Amino acid sequence: MVTAIIDVPREGLAAVESDATTTERPQRRVVVAEELGYCWGVRRALDIVQDAAGRGGPIAPIGDVIHNPQVVERLRSRGVEGAGSVDEAVGRGFRRVAITAHGMGPHLAEQASSAGVELVDTTCPLVTKVQRLAQKLVRQGYFLVVYGDSYHPEVKSVIAWAGTSKAIAAKKISDLPWNAKRGESGEGKIVPPRKVGVVSQTTKNVDELMKFAMELQSMVVPEGGEFRLCNTICEPTSERQHALKRLVERDHVDLILAIGGKKSSNTARLAEVGNSMGVRSYHIERPEEIEDAWLAEATTVGVTAGASTPDDVIEDVVGALAARGYAPPEGGIRHIDPDYVPAF
């Protein structure tokens, strides 16, 4: 088991003076979620692409390997530079391309083969599992609904692997082409097909998925309809959401900072979880984004981070809070991983 402890200097902590006639303000402090930052799927993707670059030279992921701008910039200095397509990568002189951690449809392998370039696959195995499950549901005759963001590369990849027009991405019922329950009739009524299966983008909020699924189920099951829900939200995403809930309940935080790239879906979900619990929550990429107005009435600040956020960025945010008079978490920020030491 590898334990990495990030120590945050206490320089800049404000001294609080009091006397017999003055009521001390409670100590301002930072608390951190038990689970935050890099997940094993992200670490695996970074390992693969950096190893490939080290062995064979420059490589172009089709998109961002992970959704974190600091990491993408560091990879660029190591010969890993994103491209929008295989054709673009070839035009810029790359002879190797990579599938990002979010996955791609089968067309990318075909394009790479046609262009005569090597293809390196960093797809998270949990995303691959969703892709295969989508294929299975379609083979079994289900209309596939992917709960997620239609623009997200993972969702696009799942629909591409389903290989059918009988698949759609949706985040709310109104995104679907149906507006009535099975068995209902009348002008303008569009009912679901008899069999509907649901999978989820791996980085979604489990509570929101269940609400969506229950509402859709009520539309499908009348008149002998079949509904199947496959909760494919990944364990690291769920762990980070549950850890944040525990932090809010245990430490009575006044403010939450969810750290991660602005493209990071799972970081956005963390901010949503905090706001849903009645705590002001902000999604930030860098410590420079912290606004003094946020801290005006915040005694306890909770910190969490998405699955693609490197340790040093978390450290920088906690350090910025320390410079504003917040006591860092006791013992630093503890990251425990049984089989991996982060590269960044």
Residue ranges and their predicted role:
Residues M1-F344:
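The feature marks the mature, well-folded catalytic cores of soluble enzymes
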